[in-house]
């Protein structure tokens, strides 16, 4: 019998179109790069995968209280998170980008002009929100990255900051809701690239070694590349190579606990093309 992995999905409270993803909608199917990758890892580890919901703003509490076992949601690897948690090998490249209204392209064609505005929007607690703080700009915090785009369209914000992976999907996809009114600014606001990783509680090395070993196997056999191509992410997915160090850990209790319990809980947010819902066939 397969064991069960529960992947916690942090969903927004509104239903969106199939292009934008959806949450709490009837007759929908959960799809996306991370969703398919999690399913592939589950199959490789001999466990089934189930998706549940948490609040991303309380992800630290959810992880430390053992409501979830992994955070796996296009999560940016940071030194603070590496010090606090066990972090997987990076599996995707990302950067923070500025989103503006097309009508404001000339108004905000330099970083200095952007910084003249006191209306910058980003998801609270995100890498984008942190960057806005680093720039000395005034943050309008929203509860999900997708809400950054609605703030811009409504005029409540002048500049939005979000992951390039998500921005390219929502804005550059032909026919998407925001492609006619918004644009990814060519102005660079971030000095460094970012990397996505998966987090486990600090000390749970054996569990993370299992995840890393599976990811390396799925890279080697082409599974990750196939999933990336499906979601238009071939140019940002990163290779993961196996290292024997992942088999050298003697304390395997964190994985043994999961295996004995028969399920693992992972935190997600609604984040196309990483995780989103479409109408079920």
Regions found by a protein language model. Give the residues of each.
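Bacterial N-terminal signal peptides that target proteins for export
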Residues: 1-10
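Bilobed "Venus flytrap"/periplasmic-binding protein-like clamshell domains
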Residues: 28-43, 75, 93-149, 164-168, ...
């Amino acid at each position: 019998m397969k064991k069960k992995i529960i992947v916690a999905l942090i969903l927004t409270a509104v239903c969106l179109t199939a292009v934008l993803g959806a949450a709490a909608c009837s007759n929908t199917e959960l799809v996306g790069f991370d969703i398919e990758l999690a399913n592939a890892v589950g199959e490789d580890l001999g466990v089934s995968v189930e998706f549940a919901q948490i609040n991303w703003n309380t992800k630290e509490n959810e992880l430390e209280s053992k409501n979830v076992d992994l955070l796996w949601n296009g999560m940016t690897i940071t030194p603070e998170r590496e010090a606090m948690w066990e972090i997987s090998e990076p599996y995707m490249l990302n950067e923070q980008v500025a989103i503006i209204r097309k009508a404001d392209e000339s108004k905000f064609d330099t970083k200095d002009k952007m910084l003249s505005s006191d209306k910058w929007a980003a998801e609270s607690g995100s890498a984008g929100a942190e960057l806005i703080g680093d720039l000395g700009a005034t943050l309008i915090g929203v509860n999900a990255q997708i809400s950054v785009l609605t703030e811009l369209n409504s005029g409540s914000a002048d500049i939005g900051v979000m992951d390039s992976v998500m921005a390219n999907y929502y804005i550059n996809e032909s026919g998407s809701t925001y492609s006619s009114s918004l644009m990814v600014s060519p102005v660079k606001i971030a000095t460094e690239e970012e990397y996505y990783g998966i987090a486990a509680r600090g000390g749970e090395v054996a569990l993370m070694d299992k995840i890393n070993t599976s990811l390396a196997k799925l890279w080697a056999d082409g599974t990750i590349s196939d999933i990336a191509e499906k979601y238009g992410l071939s140019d940002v997915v990163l290779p993961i190579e196996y290292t024997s160090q992942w088999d050298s850990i003697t304390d395997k209790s964190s994985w043994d606990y999961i295996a004995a319990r028969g399920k693992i809980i992972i935190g997600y947010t609604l984040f196309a093309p990483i995780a989103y819902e479409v109408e079920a066939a």
